[in-house]
Regions:
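Short, conserved loop/helix-junction motifs that constitute active-site signature segments
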Residues: 46-49, 130, 203-210
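Conserved AMP-binding/adenylation subdomain of ANL enzymes
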Residues: 108-137, 145-185
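Conserved S/T- and glycine-rich ATP-binding loop of Class I adenylate-forming
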Residues: 6, 23, 94, 100-103, ...
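Hydrophobic packing residues within well-ordered alpha-helices of enzyme cores
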Residues: 19, 63-64, 124, 197, ...
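Short acidic active-site motifs
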Residues: 40-41, 171-174, 224-225
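Adenylate-forming
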Residues: 11, 60, 140-143, 167-168, ...
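Carrier-protein-dependent adenylate-forming modules in NRPS/ANL systems
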Residues: 1-115, 128-129, 158
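Core-facing hydrophobic residues within beta-strands of well-ordered domains
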Residues: 51, 89, 184, 208-211
Length: 229
């Protein structure tokens, strides 16, 4: 149906971002769902959103989604579609819907309009004196609103996303081996994730010579952490 939101199941990949843009250019908000989520979360989100379609970028778990069409990435890539600017999401239309964790019950959908997103991106790019064509650390899965702080500013500024996969962030050994090898100049995370990285002796200017900006959201930034940085 026209204006119905579309669920997108997958990880931190190019195909996910391409799917986001495909949805909004066809007039539909998208609902990103991380592929490490369980089947119950997927069904609860569908029950709340009434989404009639899920794009399967990564393999779906065994799940019974009644009256929901499953479209594989290969079917989209091989399809023949027309793009009409009149269909684009704009103004007060929902651009994306991100669902809460649901720890206190059913997940709740937070609806963000095109104008909301545009205002946020313009603010970030104009107020923080970021490098030209910035390279952002993309640590948060796209199902978290934190990810928007790197995703769309990177797209608008012809920048780059340097992805830190979810499985790496869950393993200190992998994390502390991987971070020093990554090249980015804008750090985006929660304050608590940065605090965790203080445990690594290589989390310093010597091992991250290009890093010029720290952008935090989602939590309060303690004064002590700001001083350490």
């Amino acid at each position: 149906p026209k204006d119905a939101p579309i669920m997108i199941w997958g990880g931190q990949t190019f195909e996910m971002i391409a799917s986001f843009l495909g949805c909004v250019k066809s007039g539909h908000a998208y609902i990103p769902i991380a592929s490490y989520s369980n089947a119950e979360r997927l069904t609860m989100i569908q029950d709340v959103s009434k989404s009639p379609l899920v794009l399967e970028i990564d393999p779906l778990p065994e799940v019974d989604l009644t009256d929901v069409k499953v479209l594989k990435a290969s079917e989209v890539e091989d399809g023949d579609f027309e793009v009409n600017e009149k269909d684009f999401v704009e103004g007060d239309d929902n651009y994306y819907i991100i669902f809460t964790s649901g720890t206190t019950g059913k997940p709740k959908g937070v609806q963000i309009s095109h104008d909301n997103l545009l205002s946020f991106v313009n603010w970030e790019l104009s107020d923080f004196n970021l490098p030209e064509h910035p390279s952002f650390l993309a640590q948060a899965p796209y199902s978290f609103d934190l990810s928007v702080m790197s995703l769309y500013p990177a797209l608008v500024s012809a920048g780059k996303l340097v992805v830190l996969p979810h499985d790496v962030t869950q393993n200190f050994g992998k994390l502390f081996q991987t971070l020093p090898k990554m090249q980015f100049n804008v750090w985006v995370s929660t304050p608590s994730f940065a605090q965790m990285c203080f445990l690594d002796k290589t989390f310093d200017q010597e091992h991250h010579p290009d890093l010029s900006h720290f952008l935090f959201c989602g939590e309060e930034l303690p004064h002590s952490e700001a001083e350490m940085l």
